[in-house]
């Protein structure tokens, strides 16, 4: 079906760690988020091409991705991939402007979308019968320092029944790089 938002899993979630995409989609569905998929039209976001200096390949991939989202009738990309989020949120708008391409696409990390539903009282996590536990969150370089998404993942953790968020000593802007 057509929706104003499309879920973009990214290469890792689509081809390597598919449980990430499946869990993200299940969570978005459970929260009542209306979205569709690009399916065969989804390409790599172009991060590898950009960092390798393959500018022409990167530009082609970016143009194809923007066209695919627009052809789907969407104006919002929801992603679970930190690199895709960075590209759609920060890099694509800059390059589209530089190349004279109409962009007009909003990017949201799935944690932002679900946290909005929790805040609005439209979604809550069910009690799962697990013993109380403590959980921490690592702010990745792409999601944290580049896309500046710090609170939504924490809000979701805090919304989980019987789960306590414990902050690492180095968090948010001061989080250590994981080394990837």
Label each PLM-derived region with a short phrase.
Residues 1-180:
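Iron-sulfur cluster-binding electron-transfer modules in prokaryotic oxidoreductases
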